[in-house]
Amino acid sequence: MKRTATLLVVALILALNTAQAGQLQALEDYYRDVETVQGVFNQFTLDDRGQVIEESSGDFAIHRPDRFHWSYAGPFSQEIIADGERLWVYDVELDQVTVRDQRAVLGSAPAQLLSGDYADLEELFELAETEDYVRLTPRDGGEAFDEARLGMRDGHPSALEIDDALGQVTRVELDEVRLNDAVDEERFRFEPPEGVDVYEADPDEGIR
């Protein structure tokens, strides 16, 4: 569940912007103006009764259009790195790395947000805005989530929620967000540590 939610989260964070007024316009401005995004996060998964069933935290760095590093500090340490060609998922406690062709994994909505433009966004999602957030509803009913909501506060990305087909909600609260700061490019390179098991995933296998 964590890895599925993570790819959705990372992809959708890319659609957040710092503007508060005219949020759809802010999305378009994002694709024009924002290259890097960094910060820390707290992530919660809620069941269909609104009870928290999983909680985690960590930090992230994104370098558009095709690189990111999403790091979970606990309770189960995990690193997810996209280097532009391959997607690495390193489960630290399991001493296990799963690697995939990034283009195959990120080639469809919502992960296509990583490399798309605003026209792609409009093609993939029905967009609606309120005073507090932008709602994204997949045009293709076969996507991995039913709806996402992106929120901004005080001029920076603050939270997003994803409703999945099982009735669960993944909520991510973002803090210490920095836009267009320099990012150490080593964050987007990954060499499996000595002794870990490395698995090449089937190109048609999704993130689970």
From Swiss-Prot:
Range of residues in the leader sequence: 1-21
Family according to the record: Belongs to the LolA family.
Disulphide bridges: none
Quaternary structure and partners: Monomer.
GO cellular component, one term: outer membrane-bounded periplasmic space
Gene Ontology BP annotations: lipoprotein localization to outer membrane; lipoprotein transport
This protein's name: Outer-membrane lipoprotein carrier protein
Entry keyword Signal: yes
The protein's role, per its UniProt record: Participates in the translocation of lipoproteins from the inner membrane to the outer membrane. Only forms a complex with a lipoprotein if the residue after the N-terminal Cys is not an aspartate (The Asp acts as a targeting signal to indicate that the lipoprotein should stay in the inner membrane).
Keywords: Chaperone, Periplasm, Protein transport, Signal, Transport
Subcellular location: Periplasm
InterPro entries to which the protein is assigned, alphabetical: LolA/LolB/LppX, OM_lipoprot_carrier_LolA-like, OM_lipoprot_carrier_LolA_Pbac
